[in-house]
Amino acid sequence: MKIYLVRHGETDWNQAGRLQGQTDIDLDAQGFAQAAEAAERLKEVPFEIAFCSPLIRARHTAETIVGERKITLTTDERLRELNFGPWEGTDVRKIREGANSPFTDPGSYLPPEGAESFAQLYARGGEFVKRVLLPLE
């Protein structure tokens, strides 16, 4: 089995340097163009199935790549981005400069209240692989 991983296209928050996390932000014009470019690069890949996060930026990217293919695109909550809780919408530079930055020292990152730890992210991602992808082999 081959697995292709594609990151969603750009959003206004990416452009502004704001931390998105699980906030449901759509693609901007550049993001839609990036999705179209990814679709063009992957047009010869014979996908049998596709999965994405239910977040609109991921859905629009995946829908563009899937295009007219006669395959199922399934959203799964376990593919959502890390939940940064109260930090979502914050300037990423402020988070990077902080003492508890998930970007500079992920191993010692302690999520703020209402946010998700990397262990939780890995657990739900691993659960997706175990329950959804491995049975496809």
Where are these regions (language model features)?
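Extreme N-terminal starter segment of soluble prokaryotic enzymes
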Residues: 1-4
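Active-site beta-alpha turn of Rossmann-fold NAD(P)-dependent dehydrogenases/reductases
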Residues: 7
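Loop-to-helix element that buttresses phosphate recognition and phosphoryl-transfer chemistry
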Residues: 10-61, 111-126
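Active-site/binding-pocket entry motifs
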Residues: 12, 101-102
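Active-site-adjacent alpha-helix immediately C-terminal to a catalytic or transition-state-stabilizing loop
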Residues: 12-13, 59, 68-70, 127-137
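Phosphate-coordination/substrate-recognition cap region in phosphate-metabolizing enzymes
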Residues: 37-100
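Short amphipathic alpha-helical segments with coiled-coil-like heptad repeat character
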Residues: 39-40, 102-104, 129-131
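A conserved pocket-lining segment of Rossmann-fold NAD(P)-dependent short-chain dehydrogenase/reductase
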Residues: 104-110
